[in-house]
């Protein structure tokens, strides 16, 4: 008998035997088997069969438990294993006879249930009492099988295979579970046209990730439900197949193929009533092929696809289609391509407006129309690595989620007041132990203060709860209204006009009036509210900023003032280069005011001048101004790119070369942080081909890396530095205008015209004057003073000492760098020796003064170093 049992039948009989041992029963009865069938894992086929004859599962289980409890039990250490009772043998014999009658090769759990109903004695009576007679069960069993025979050891997993391995999208549309699909009429019409063909009626939707391929299929499901399709598709079921579920748990070779064959047979038996949908269609190529087998899912589908027996809609991305589907021409020719293009910003706004109600109901917040417009436009401009409408929908969803989190969290006023109350309570406990008069008086004052704050806290908390209730009330009403509209639509579709009229002319208008009243009440509360209840354009901009680091929101008053004073801020670090500071400041202001060219970098400059005059320092100061960190910039030393083959390191090695997967040093840095300062230092030392790469960046604000990805440079400030012609700038015999002209001539002879023509500005840094060196000396001294302050040392430097530093450190050919070295050697080195020797201790004041042609460094008490 074992050889004829299916896997689940064997498991059920073993479980029944174990139950008999546990209960101490000498006989294995049909009641044990019935309980095992009801309580086993993956027993949905048994429960579905009993549900089909409207039997009460709980009552059947209770009846079987009662029978088992009434059986005689045997105790002792030498109890023999339970033996099948006469009734049990009769049940198995009846099950075998029924299996033979139905032409089945294996004995399944359904056969055993039929045997219990027919020959199970008391257990059969329990089933009969619940309306599950052998005759009714056999009819339900035949209907569920659909004419298929049991020819494998796992037939139970094959019944209702389509239901098990698929999701009915038309049922979801009927229940209002799918989001509305706005637009995409042309794509849906093309899909319907292909599905209406006689053969090869299989459209495949191809497009970039996030453009709405799955939404097109959901739109088709909604049209089928509404009847807005040709006769050939009316009343059809659109089922999304889950290949992952088919593969999951397929332990043995051929198990996946068996499941897929069962699904395909069920689709074929439906006589064209089922249209299938496979998302990520490329997964069918290679799915299920194990070892040396060539029979993957794609090859199993081909015959039915070609004959028109299987109407299938696929969806995949352009890259996956090219890599997987096009490599199998026999599979490709069975599908008809439907290209789903990225919608425009205007179309995306329309889509967002259609989805707005769903997101408002889910998050229980209001979403302003300006937020939808901002989501579409800002995502299109700043999130270039993804596609509309998906990225815009994500922005709205996350902004609404943030606001909901803020609403559910305590407002700042309540939080601060609660902390204050907690502090006063702790203080009260501490002072309460004191008995002196001063402490008692302080305790009295503290308790009065605590009572006032607790009363204020109660008032604020009550107000906050009221505001939250008002917000939640509006959200709940919107959700209920959405649900009732769905019910009304279903009632109209099903011809239940009585229910539809009750909803449309009774409940829905009442609910709309309640919603209007609740919204008005909310507006009253909102005039002086503690919590914000509407997602606005600024919230969307905040999400964009958190994703990309790009400040896309409106300028706050403090930031406006900061930008207007940008020259002063940069001038605190960069001495004497007014033209360069103004050029960079103007570029940043254009960008933040929103009037910069959106298709070019924020600014691109070539800084020219002798060494040590502040070219690199200005780039650092700019990064510090924008990001509060001078290291927050992409700095590339172009002397490392002096050879032709090293150019590929900027954008990444081409395919087949070492480092292909790593990406380029320039492109990867900007891709990770699109709003940044890019400093290309000493560009004249780079190979000429580097400038050919930069042409695209300077003109269109984009660059394609070694892996074919387009990197967006439109939010970067590009700074290139060079020493070309610096010998003219330090020549004291020529005027300023002539110096600059000579430098520009050298630059024009060194760089191609098309490169120079794309730069926003060529900024010539002038040599530093004596006065400017004095100011730089003060900056260097201030830096040293800050480092000494960490050791609680105070540094005092006289004006005479500063003048000496400026004189001694003045070398026009080398700029301010000799001055930095002089401060380090003349002051820093001496201080280091004395600190280590203990001559200067923490808390001392150090004085630096000039004595003749020397610098005197010593404690303020007068001792020199």
From Swiss-Prot:
**Localization, UniProt:** Cytoplasm
Task: Cite the binding residues for ATP 1.
Answer: 207-214
Q: Which residues form a coiled coil?
A: 393-527
Spell out the residue ranges making up region: Repeat 2: 84-147
In the record, what terms sit under GO molecular function? ATP binding; ATP hydrolysis activity
Q: Where is this region: Repeat 1?
A: 5-71
Clp R domain residues are 1-147
Annotated region Linker: the residues are: 343-549
Q: Where is this region: C-terminal?
A: 768-865
**Annotated region NBD2: where?**
559-767
* Record InterPro entries: AAA+_ATPase, ATPase_AAA_core, Chaperonin_ClpB, Clp_ATPase_C, Clp_N_dom_sf, Clp_R_dom, ClpA/B, ClpA/B_CS1
A single GO cellular-component term on record: cytoplasm
Question: What is this protein for, i.e. what is its function?
Answer: Part of a stress-induced multi-chaperone system, it is involved in the recovery of the cell from heat-induced damage, in cooperation with DnaK, DnaJ and GrpE. Acts before DnaK, in the processing of protein aggregates. Protein binding stimulates the ATPase activity; ATP hydrolysis unfolds the denatured protein aggregates, which probably helps expose new hydrophobic binding sites on the surface of ClpB-bound aggregates, contributing to the solubilization and refolding of denatured protein aggregates by DnaK.
Kindly give the NCBIfam families that the UniProt entry links to this protein. Answer: chaperone_ClpB
Quote the record's domain comment.
Answer: The Clp repeat (R) domain probably functions as a substrate-discriminating domain, recruiting aggregated proteins to the ClpB hexamer and/or stabilizing bound proteins. The NBD2 domain is responsible for oligomerization, whereas the NBD1 domain stabilizes the hexamer probably in an ATP-dependent manner. The movement of the coiled-coil domain is essential for ClpB ability to rescue proteins from an aggregated state, probably by pulling apart large aggregated proteins, which are bound between the coiled-coils motifs of adjacent ClpB subunits in the functional hexamer.
Subunit composition and interactions: Homohexamer. The oligomerization is ATP-dependent.
Record protein name field: Chaperone protein ClpB
Q: Which organism is it from?
A: Streptomyces coelicolor (strain ATCC BAA-471 / A3(2) / M145)
Question: From which lineage does this chain's organism come?
Answer: Bacteria, Bacillati, Actinomycetota, Actinomycetes, Kitasatosporales
